[in-house]
Amino acid sequence: MIFAGIGFGFHKAAKEQKRLEQGIAIKRMLYLLQGEIRYGFTPLPEAVLKISTKTEKEYQPFLKKVAKQLETHSEESFAKIWQQTADQKLKQVIYEPKFYEILKNMGETIGYLDQQMQEKTILLTIEQLDDQIFLMKDQVVKNCKMYR
């Protein structure tokens, strides 16, 4: 019984830590996207495809599907493709619902803007993630100590 409780505690602590790490990984992914747009002067659909090979494996299917959908369904808006694909590929992957919502909502505004506004939209999304990560850090540390 004691070992089960200890095992459960370590499992919960690892899950808490993973939630925080996912926020940092999403932030890293957005920095890559911003860099492709800013310094590579890459159009958004191509930039999404390029960063899909540079991000963590759990986000690669999402990015690759967005890029493929943009290529094959040019009549659909970027926002619609981004949000539908997020529902299909990210909802079950991202543990923290707020990270998922922030990333999903970015698709509403980024697709139809010029390069400068795309960069600012990505930066705003990164700031929202930073705020959420900051709020989570103390809670994760406390919870991890309690679970262990």
Regions found by a protein language model. Name each.
Residues 1-2, 148:
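Hydrophobic H-region at the start of alpha-helical membrane spans
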Residues 2-71:
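Juxtamembrane/interface alpha-helical elements of multi-pass membrane proteins
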Residues 9-11, 27, 87-88, 116, ...:
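Generic detector of short, locally flexible boundary/turn motifs and exposed helical patches
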Residues 21, 94-98, 121:
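A generic short alpha-helical patch detector that favors 3-5-residue windows
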Residues 26-29, 33, 66, 85, ...:
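Amphipathic alpha-helices that form helix-helix packing interfaces
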Residues 36-39, 100, 140-141:
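Low-complexity, flexible helical/coil segments
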Residues 41-113:
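Glycine- and small-hydrophobic-enriched helix-loop-helix hairpins
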Residues 109-148:
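Membrane-interface, cytosolic juxtamembrane amphipathic helix immediately N-terminal to a transmembrane helix
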